[in-house]
Design a protein with these regions (language model features):
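Extended active-site neighborhood of metal-dependent phosphoesterases/phosphodiesterases
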Residues: 108-203, 209, 277-285, 298, ...
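N-terminal active-site segment of His-dependent metallophosphoesterases
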Residues: 26-107
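His/acidic metal-ligating clusters that form di-metal
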Residues: 84-92, 122, 179-181, 191-282, ...
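Active-site environment of divalent metal-dependent phosphoester hydrolases
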Residues: 43-46, 101-104, 132-141, 188-191, ...
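Beta-strand-turn-beta hairpins that frame and shape the catalytic cleft
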Residues: 26-35, 44-49, 167-182, 213, ...
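Divalent metal-coordination and catalytic microenvironments
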Residues: 39, 93, 98, 113, ...
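Sec-dependent signal peptide cleavage junction
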Residues: 15-28
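Non-catalytic terminal accessory segments
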Residues: 2, 26-29, 318-572
C-alpha cells in the first residue's frame, strides 16, 4: 500500500515539477521597440470649421460621431509619424485598422494616408504594417479586399510570407526573431467579426506553426478585440469581440502567441487570458489615434520583459489646418497648437454631455418598444433626462429633494448627474481610472437613479413605475443566474433593500457597470508584462485540477477502506 501511495505522491510531484516549474527566463537578446496605433480615422478636411463632410455632399455607408476629429485627422497622423521618426528606438509601426473613416466608400482617403506612410518610410527607413478595420473595405462597396491590399501593398503585403486568398490577412517576418500575423477580423459585410470562420483561424494557426518551426516568436494585430475587456462585453456590445474568444485565445496562447494588438472600441485597455495549459496571452485594445483620446502606445521588448507606455498627441500644426479649413477661433487654434489633449477632452466632453442629455432612453440602453418593460422604463429615463443638469447640491439641489423622499445622496465633486456620467465615460475610455463597484462614483449614480425612480413614481398617474430588475438585466443579455448574482453582490455592498434601489442598481449597471470590473491586474496605460523568453507558471489549472482529483481518490479510499488510513497518514 505504501508503494501505491508513493506512486500517487510521485505523480503529484512530477506534475508539480512539470506544470509548476515557476518562471524562468532565457538570456536577453537585444531590445526591440515599436509603436502601435489604431482607429486613425482619416477624413478629407471640410472647407469650414463648422461644417462636416456630410453637409458638404459626402454620401457614405458609415457616418462617424460628432466627436470625431474630422479636420484634424491628417495632422494627427503627421504628428504621430513625426514622433515615431524622431524616436531613435522605434523600429517599426503597427496600425490595427480603421485607417480611413469613409475608407470603404472613397479610395482617395486611403490613398492620402498611404502617401503619408510612404513618405515616412522613405525618410526614416522604418516600416509600417497595417491591417484593415470595419471602416476600410467591404463587399459591394467602392473599396473591397483587393483594393485595400493594392493601396497598402507596401505596408506588409509586398514582403509577406503568406497572404490569405480570401481576406486581408497576411504574415510577415519583422526581423530575425519575430513574425507578425495580421488577422483580418471583418467579414464581407464589414461590420461583423467572423462567425466561426474556421478557414481564417486555420490560416492563422498555420502561419504561427510555420514561424515556430523556424524558431520565431509571433505577435498579432487585428481590428476587433480578441478578449472581453469589461464584464459581458460580448453580450452587450455586438461586433466588438471575435467569436469564441476564449477558445481561440487559448489556442493562440498554447501556440506561443503572447502579444495581440486590437482596436475598434476606442478604449485604452489591456487584459489577459490563461489557457488550460497555463499559457498567458495579452490583448491590448488600443486607444483611437484619430478620435478622443488621440493616443498610441510604444512597446519595448526583451526576452525577459515587455514594457509599454501610452503616448499622447500633444499638439498639431493648427496653422496649416486653419489654411485648409477656415473658421477656427484663435482660442481653438492656440489650444490645438499647445494642448491638443485638452482640446480633444473639451470637444468629446461637450458631445457626450449632449448625448447623455438627449439620448438616455430605453432604446439607447437596449430595450425595444415592443418590450413589456418599455413603458415603465421610459418614465424613469425621461425623469433622468429632466434631472440630468439639475444641481446635485445646494438649497434646491437633488440632495435636498431626495431627503424629502427618504434618500440620502452622498457628497461628491460632481455638480450634476450629467457631469458624473460624462466624466466617468471619458475617463474610462482613456484608461486613466479603473472604477470599482465600491467607488463613490457608482454609489452616487445608483442613488441619483433611485431618486429619479421614486420621484417618477410619486408623479405618475398610477404611481407604478417599478420594473423588474432581473427581467431588465436578462433582456440586456445577462442570464437569469448572472442577473441574480449581480443584484445580490451589489445589494450586499450597498445594503440596498427597497425595490426602487434594486431597480436603480440594475439601471446603473447597464449605464455604468462595464466600467467597474477591470480586475485582471494588467495595467491599461503604462506597465510591463513577462517577455517571450519567460515561461510563466503553467500550474494554473491542469496541475491544480490533477492534484484535487488525486486528493479525492485518497479520500474515497480512506472512506471505504478505513484499514488503509494509517498508511495515508504516515505517508502524507
Amino acid at each position: 500500500m505504501k508503494k501505491f501511495i508513493s506512486v500517487l505522491l510521485a505523480l503529484i510531484l512530477i506534475c508539480g515539477s512539470a506544470f509548476t516549474a515557476g518562471v524562468y527566463a532565457q538570456e536577453d537578446k537585444s531590445e526591440i521597440c515599436f509603436a502601435v496605433a489604431s482607429d486613425v480615422h482619416y477624413v478629407t478636411p471640410a472647407k469650414t470649421a463648422t461644417s462636416t463632410p456630410y453637409n458638404e455632399g459626402v454620401e457614405t455607408t458609415f457616418k462617424s460621431g460628432k466627436d470625431s476629429l474630422y479636420n484634424q485627422s491628417g495632422f494627427i497622423i503627421d504628428e504621430f509619424l513625426d514622433q515615431c521618426a524622431k524616436n531613435p528606438e522605434c523600429r517599426f509601426v503597427l496600425i490595427t485598422g480603421d485607417i480611413a473613416t469613409h475608407g470603404r466608400d472613397f479610395a482617395s482617403e486611403h490613398e492620402a494616408v498611404a502617401a503619408k506612410f510612404r513618405k515616412f518610410e522613405q525618410e526614416t527607413g522604418k516600416q509600417v504594417y497595417v491591417i484593415n478595420g470595419n471602416h476600410d473595405s467591404a463587399l459591394n462597396c467602392a473599396v473591397g479586399r483587393e483594393d485595400f491590399i493594392s493601396i497598402y501593398h507596401e505596408f506588409g503585403y509586398d514582403k509577406a510570407v503568406s497572404v490569405d486568398e480570401n481576406t486581408c490577412s497576411y504574415s510577415v517576418n519583422l526581423n530575425d526573431e519575430y513574425t507578425l500575423v495580421a488577422l483580418d477580423t471583418c467579414d464581407e459585410r464589414y461590420r461583423v467579426v467572423p462567425n466561426n470562420d474556421l478557414s481564417r483561424m486555420n490560416w492563422a494557426v498555420t502561419q504561427i506553426r510555420n514561424a515556430k518551426r523556424e524558431g520565431r516568436k509571433v505577435i498579432m494585430i487585428m481590428h476587433h478585440n480578441l478578449l472581453e475587456h469589461n464584464p459581458y462585453q460580448k453580450a452587450l456590445e455586438k461586433n466588438y469581440v471575435v467569436d469564441t474568444p476564449y477558445s481561440f485565445a487559448g489556442l493562440l496562447a498554447d501556440l506561443g502567441v503572447k502579444l495581440v494588438f486590437s482596436g475598434h472600441t476606442h478604449v485604452t485597455s489591456a487584459t489577459s487570458y490563461t489557457s488550460f495549459l497555463g499559457n498567458t496571452i495579452y490583448d491590448f485594445s488600443m486607444p483611437s489615434l484619430g478620435n478622443f483620446p488621440a493616443e498610441y502606445k510604444l512597446f519595448k521588448m526583451t526576452d525577459s520583459e515587455i514594457k509599454y507606455e501610452t503616448k499622447k498627441i500633444e499638439h498639431i500644426d493648427a496653422d496649416k489646418l486653419a489654411e485648409v479649413c477656415k473658421g477656427y477661433s484663435k482660442k481653438d487654434i492656440a489650444l490645438m497648437k499647445n494642448d491638443f489633449q485638452q482640446y480633444t477632452w473639451n470637444r468629446s466632453h461637450a458631445v457626450y454631455s449632449e448625448k447623455i442629455r438627449k439620448d438616455i432612453s430605453p432604446e439607447t440602453i437596449g430595450i425595444k418598444e415592443s418590450s413589456a418593460l418599455y413603458g415603465k422604463l421610459k418614465l424613469v429615463t425621461d425623469g433622468l433626462r429632466e434631472l440630468s443638469d439639475t444641481p446635485i447640491y445646494g438649497e434646491n439641489g437633488i440632495q435636498t429633494m431626495a431627503a424629502a423622499y427618504g434618500l440620502e445622496i452622498p457628497n461628491s465633486s460632481y455638480s450634476t448627474l450629467n457631469e458624473a456620467l460624462t466624466t466617468a465615460y471619458l475617463t474610462y475610455k482613456s484608461g486613466r481610472r479603473i472604477y470599482s463597484q465600491d467607488s463613490d462614483d457608482f454609489k452616487l449614480i445608483v442613488k441619483l437613479i433611485a431618486f429619479s425612480i421614486r420621484k417618477s413614481a410619486a408623479e405618475a398617474a398610477d404611481g407604478d413605475v417599478l420594473f423588474d430588475a432581473n427581467a431588465f438585466l436578462r433582456e440586456l443579455g445577462y442570464s437569469g443566474t448572472v442577473a441574480d448574482n449581480i443584484l445580490k453582490e451589489f445589494s450586499k455592498k450597498y445594503g440596498f433593500a427597497t425595490p426602487e434601489e434594486k431597480a436603480a442598481l440594475s439601471l446603473a449597471f447597464a449605464l455604468f457597470g462595464g466600467f467597474c470590473s477591470d480586475t485582471d491586474g494588467v495595467e491599461n496605460r503604462d506597465g510591463s508584462i513577462p517577455g517571450y523568453g519567460v515561461k510563466e507558471a503553467a500550474q494554473n489549472r491542469f496541475a491544480a485540477a490533477f492534484e484535487k482529483i488525486l486528493i479525492k481518490i485518497i479520500e474515497i479510499i480512506k472512506k471505504f477502506y478505513p484499514i488503509f488510513n494509517q498508511f495515508f497518514e504516515k505517508s502524507i
